[in-house]
Amino acid sequence: GIPCGESCVWIPCLTSAVGCSCKSKVCYRN
């Protein structure tokens, strides 16, 4: 539920390496 400061409209979340995932075109962590 914490925004990772990255969008995932065009590309996947690069922050997925630190546990972030794409939700509603924005990368979130928990």
From Swiss-Prot:
InterPro entries: Cyclotide, Cyclotide_bracelet_CS, Cyclotide_sf. This is a cyclic peptide. Disulfide bonds join C4-C20, C8-C22, C13-C27. GO terms for biological process: defense response. There is a cross-link at G1-N30 (Cyclopeptide (Gly-Asn)). PROSITE patterns: CYCLOTIDE, CYCLOTIDE_BRACELET. The keyword Zinc does not apply. Pfam families: Cyclotide. Belongs to the cyclotide family. Bracelet subfamily. This is Cycloviolacin-O9.
